[in-house]
Amino acid sequence: MVERDNELKGTTFTISVLHISDGKPERIRQLLAAKVAQAPQFFNCAPLVINVERLADIPDFDQLKGLVESEDFVLVGITGARDEAMKTAAKAAGLAVMASGKSRKVEPLPLPEPTPSPVAEVKAAPAPLVPSKVHVGPVRSGQQLYAAGTSLVILGSVSQGAEVIADDSIHIYGALRGRAIAGAKGNTQARIYCQQLQAELLSIAGTFQLSDALPAGLIQQPVHVRLDNEQLRIDHIK
């Protein structure tokens, strides 16, 4: 068995950002509780970053951290800090200080190209096809379906409070009133299709949208959902 050295690699995660304009604990608690109520399993132990750009005063970060964790989120850091005092206070509470927006990519230094050695061409065997998981009938409230390594096809409606998950795409031949999570293991090419959109939550590869952010003109309409530039795009199916 070949031992590999420890490695530090860069990667990208989708993290919810909470924008606050005051540090009043009760208002923050109510907002988080409302989001958790919409999708309890999705937000369970979910990482959270707080944008403090609109705060005039430095909040009690220890208190804020405890409040966030009491609602089953994990506070990992802040963004939008405009002065060093706020950054120092956040670091003292064990929080990361993160830059706002997207960071500029750092180009790696060019390495000398090795002299290629003749290699015999080996044709890889095609990966075996994994058949889609098909569910006939409605998915009832409290029920969860998961299609591991494949797509999920539902010949029926998904009730409010139900959850359907697939590592690939999700096809719903009925109304979607619950939660649909496609690309559960990071497949950004996954899609969600449904004949009637009333979802509590839509998610593809970790990028999600809740019911209160759905386009009003597409409610109860047949739609196709996909990732476009790291955001969910919802199109009407004609």
Swiss-Prot record:
Pfam families named among the record's database cross-references: MinC_C, MinC_N
Q: Matching Gene3D superfamilies, A to Z?
A: 2.160.20.70, 3.30.70.260
One GO biological process term is:
division septum assembly
Alphabetical list of InterPro entries matching this protein: CAP/MinC_C (IPR016098), MinC (IPR013033), MinC_C_sf (IPR036145), MinC_N (IPR007874), Septum_form_inhib_MinC_C (IPR005526)
Which first-to-last residue range defines the signal peptide?
none
UniProt keyword annotations, A-Z: Cell cycle, Cell division, Septation
Protein function: Cell division inhibitor that blocks the formation of polar Z ring septums. Rapidly oscillates between the poles of the cell to destabilize FtsZ filaments that have formed before they mature into polar Z rings. Prevents FtsZ polymerization.
Q: Which PANTHER family match?
A: SEPTUM SITE-DETERMINING PROTEIN MINC
Assembly state and interactors?
Interacts with MinD and FtsZ.
Write out the similarity annotation. Answer: Belongs to the MinC family.
Identification of the protein by name: Probable septum site-determining protein MinC
